[in-house]
Amino acid sequence: MIKPYYQDEHATIYHGDSLEIMPQLAPASIGQIFTSPPYNKGQPVGNEWTRLDNGYGEHNDNMAHPDYVAWQQNILLECWRLIEENGAIWYQHKPQSKGQNVTLPLELNPGLPLRQIVIWDRGSGFQRDGVHLVPTYEWVMLIAKNDFKVDRTTTDVWKILPNKDPHHPASFPIELPLKALQAGQNTGTVLDPFAGSGTTLRAAKDLNRNSIGIEIDKKYCEIAANRLAQEVLDFG
């Protein structure tokens, strides 16, 4: 196993590619996974693929669509191997407008049991093309094994305002993983294979749970490590 970039009593961060690191983790060793992968939204310039400015750094966020689908399916298959028999994957993604059409993240699921789709109501959005209505929601796909149980009072529409993380252009509010992890009854180790600035890991710490994060960009590994080193509750 590679050496952790950061490790404390409850959290571990690995710097590297998720598809290289996850196979080194033991099967059925993770309680819940909450993750939000890159959306593949970079724009091509000439003949070169581009990355989001100051964004995913090491990751090319404009892959050919079939390659992106295959990549995400492989990620989810590896996530499925890692979760316990009463575990689940919370996979945050969104429908995306492509010309006159919309693509759904359902195609990213390689046939795993999709228990439910949670609607993340962001409260606002942005659209200027005159073709599509303003998008104000995203998805959290709950992919769960048979024995995974949830809180009986949590609904499937979560009204959570987005935050502006100065450290990462594609962050999500900490309330999102907090709500998901608390909705699931499995309190085992939490994994985020796209850890970014460490929001999921920090949520796990605030819930007094162990966590593992994998991040390809060393800059964000350092930011996540600093967040985890804080002793006070993190509010995003």
Name the predicted role of every residue range:
Residues K219-G236:
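Cysteine-dependent PTP/DSP-like catalytic domain, specifically the C-terminal lobe
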Residues I2-E222:
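Core catalytic lobe of class I
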